[in-house]
Amino acid sequence: MIYQANNQKQRVLADFDQALVWSVVLLLSIGLIMIYSASIAIAEAQFGADRASYYLLRHSAYLAVGLLLGLVTFQVPMRIWQKYVTYLFMISVLLLALVLVPGIGHEVNGSQRWISLYVVNIQPSEFVKLFMVMYAADYVSRKAADLNSFLKGFLPITVVLSIVGFLLLLEPDFGAFFVVTALVMSILFMGGVSLKIFIALIGILAIGLYELILSSEYRMARVVAFMDPWADPYGKGYQLSHALIAFGRGEWFGVGLGGSVEKLFYLPEAHTDFLLSVLAEELGFVGVAAVILLFIWLIMRTFVIGRLAAKLGNTFSALVAQGIGIWIGVQALINMGVNMGVLPTKGLTLPLLSFGGSSITANCIALAVILRIDWENRQRLRGLNV
């Protein structure tokens, strides 16, 4: 009986990419530990010493919801996702528009990115990223023969991207706009779009991004602060200068878990956008390197899964897996770049680690989709229909 139970357990584990699963488990675990460490001071100040675990418990609840939805998501075949993705995408865009409606949208730190449900705030842009990946993957898989045509293949998806981008910029959420644009462009490139059209659009987008920065006072202020945070360390460069101080204090091995000084009201958003800075201070270069390697490994696995799906003839699944990998990779890269002073502040969370209900829920659903693709790949290799 014990032998049979062990064999059954091995068969279950063989149905999943264990390297992907463990990289996700480790990142989620590190996130929980660091959120608790980074948020103790602010939780005590806001809610009292007896509620120091407030943000940890809240994030744990978000994670539990995300894992539950991920479990449900895993049961849905990819053919069903492809069949209904257009409707899901339209709903997510509608929610993105509702954010801008007075009385429905909820403003935080000068940006109207949330819909308040009293108990929680939902950030539709996080789910738009997921469904934009699926919509673009479905579009490219259906329109593969027309991708070299500007009017038939390229223009329709560009119009859709423009509508989503316009709504994101109205919030404003420049970081999400950049990520969504990068996702669509990457999926088009992987789908085999004409190189001439692709390069032309990259040029147009680069000019557009440059103009968007120049036309916005607050974006220009962020760029100026990024160029030299020490020129105004108590004003525009305050957040970045303290993030860099946190990295400097961490050195090789950090000051020890829980020993961060910057999280004590010096570094704003320590448990959200700038969690990596607290991690760098407490765990040092070694801790940051470990997190980066886990992200690299996770992204590599998504591409391996996507490549196998392509070999098995499922273009939609292949593009979804690789698109989600690019989403996580681009957003992680931007967040890390901001924390290290390599990129201007964008307001993006670190996937799987930072505090945030919508972010962690969308991440869990996205990773469940990848696990579903991997599971379907393995079933097809065994000659089974899915």
From Swiss-Prot:
GO biological process, any: regulation of cell shape
Transmembrane regions listed in the UniProt entry: 20-40, 61-81, 85-105, 114-134, 150-170, 187-207, 279-299, 318-338, 350-370
Signal peptide range in chain numbering: none
InterPro entries referenced in this protein's UniProt entry, alphabetically: FtsW (IPR013437), FtsW/RodA (IPR001182)
Compartments, as annotated in UniProt: Cell inner membrane
Short name of one Pfam family: FTSW_RODA_SPOVE
HAMAP family associated with the record: PGT_FtsW_proteobact
Family per record: Belongs to the SEDS family. FtsW subfamily.
Purpose: Peptidoglycan polymerase that is essential for cell division.
Name of the protein this chain belongs to: Probable peptidoglycan glycosyltransferase FtsW
